[in-house]
Amino acid sequence: MMIAQELGIYVVESKGGAILCLLLSLLCLGTWPALMALLERRGRLPQHTYLDYSITNFLAAIFIAFVFGGIGESTHEAPSFITQLTQIQDNWPSVLFAMAGGVGLSIGNLATQYSLAFVGLSVTEVTAASITVVVGTTVNYFLDNGLNRADILFSGVGCFMVAVCLGSAVHSSNSADIKAKLGKLSGDCETVTPEECQRLFGVEEEEEEEKEMENVKEGSAAFLIALENKRAIKVLGKSMVVGLGITFFAGLSFSLFSPLFNLATNDQWHTLKQGVPKLIVYTAFFYFSLSCFVIAVALNISFLYKPVLDSPRSSFREYLSDWNGRGWALAAGLLCGFGNGLQFMGGQAAGYAASDAVQALPLVSTFWGIYLFGEYRRSSTRTYALLVGMLVMFTVAVGLLMASAGERETRFT
C-alpha cells in the first residue's frame, strides 16, 4: 500500500509510495512559479500576488494536517496532530526547528518571485534548485546517518552541479541573443519607452496595444519591448548580477528548510526529553507553514509601502481591491502547499536526501517557461544546445537521487 493507517495517523510506508509522492510534488512545485511569473508579466504587483499565495499555501497545510494527521486513535507513541498541538511545552525544540525551516522557505520563495523577473523562469529554478540540492542534500545525508546510498546520491549531486554550469551558460547565451535582437531595433537598449512601443504597434489605447501584443511573434524584439512596458518589474538594462545574486540568495534559503524539517521530525540532535514523542510529519508541517505564512504577510505588507527593486508602491486597500489574476495567485499557493506536504510525506519514508529530488523542478518550470512564455524562442543554435544539455543533466540527476532512496525503519520512537 502506498498510504497506510498506523496508530491513528496516515503515513507513507513503501518506497514506491514515497517516490509517487515525490513525483506529484515535483509537478506541483514546478508549476507554481510559472503562475507567479505569469502574473508579474501581466503587470500584477508581486506584493499582491505573494499575499494571495501565502493564504492558500497555509490553508493547504491546515488541510493536510487535519485530514492525514488527525484521523484515528491517538497513542503516546504516535500522537495525532491535534494531540501534539497541546504538547508544545514538551516538544517545543522540534517546533522551533520546523518554524525555522518555514522562515527559510518563505524568504526563499519571496526572493524567487523577484529573480523570476530578472533572470527568467528556467535559469532561476535551475540555479536555486541546484544550490538547494548541493547544500541541503549533503546535510540531510549525514542527518539521516547514511540512509541513502552515497555512491548514487552524490553522483546525482554532481549532475546537478554540471547542470548549474550549463544553466549559467544558457542564461549568458540567451542574454547575448536578446541584446542582439534589441540592438537591431534600437541603438539604446537600456531605455524602453511607451512611445517606442506605440511606434512599433501604431496604437494609442492600452486595450488595443494588448491585442496587438498577442499578435507579435514570441521572442522577437517587438515582443520583448511590449512585454517590458506591460510587466510589473522593469528589467531591461538592469545588471544581470542583481538577478543572479537574488537567485543565489533564494537557493541558500531553500537549502535550509529541508534539513531543519528533518531535525523537527526525527530529532537527530536529541533535543527532546526522553519519552517525548517526535513530531509527526503533519504537526511539523503545520508549524513550518505557520511561520512561513507569518513571515510572508509581514514582509509583503511592508513591501506594499516600501517596495524593493523599483517596484511600484501600493497599499493594503489597493491590494484588497486588486482581483486581476487573484485566482491564479491562490492556485499557486495551493500547488506550493500540497507540493511541500507531499515532499515531506515522501521524505519521511524514503529519506529527506532523496526527497530533495523534487528540486529537479526546473524540468517542469522550463517546460512552462517555453510553452507559456516563449522563453528561448528565436534564440541561437548555441542557446538551444546548452538548454538541451541542461535538461538532460537534470533528468539524470533526479533519477539518481530517487534511485538512492532508502526506507526508514523507525518513525515514532
Swiss-Prot record:
Domain of life: Eukaryota
Protein name per Swiss-Prot or TrEMBL: Ureide permease 5
PANTHER family found in the cross-reference section: UREIDE PERMEASE 1-RELATED-RELATED, UREIDE PERMEASE 5
Organism listed in the record: Arabidopsis thaliana
Pfam family, one: Ureide_permease
Gene Ontology BP annotations: nitrogen compound transport; response to salt stress
InterPro entries associated with the record: UPS_plant, Ureide_permease
Transmembrane portions of the chain: 19-39, 51-71, 92-112, 116-136, 150-170, 241-261, 279-299, 327-347, 353-373, 385-405
